[in-house]
Amino acid sequence: MTTCIFNQRRAGLLVHLSSVPGTHGIGDLGPGAFQVANWIAASGSTLWQMLPIGPVGRGDSPYSATSSFAIEPLFLSLEILAREKLIAPSALRAPIELAHKKTNYAKARAFKWPRFHQAFANFVAMSA
């Protein structure tokens, strides 16, 4: 018999992925997300609640997602793509303005999208 998580009190934290520490203009599912998850666990909390993570629409609001099934591509981790050898480690070097603590969707897009295209091209080439 499985235990329902709602049968007992739990504590957690609300942290949107865009707020996770990162160096590419926006938080993502890379090392920063693992740091947050580990910090939540170390604090004795058992839940990580996120705002919607769908592809953002006008105004870059998580509540204006253009799909309820997809994920915002900016939440993909360049570090993991490099670890999987889909992009070169040198592609991780970001301009200093992306390291600021405030999320900047436009600058993150300008930096990450060309790397996503390169990762896809490398994936296709490796799969052929």
Name each region found by the language model.
Residues 2-128:
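Acidic/aromatic-lined carbohydrate-recognition and catalytic surfaces
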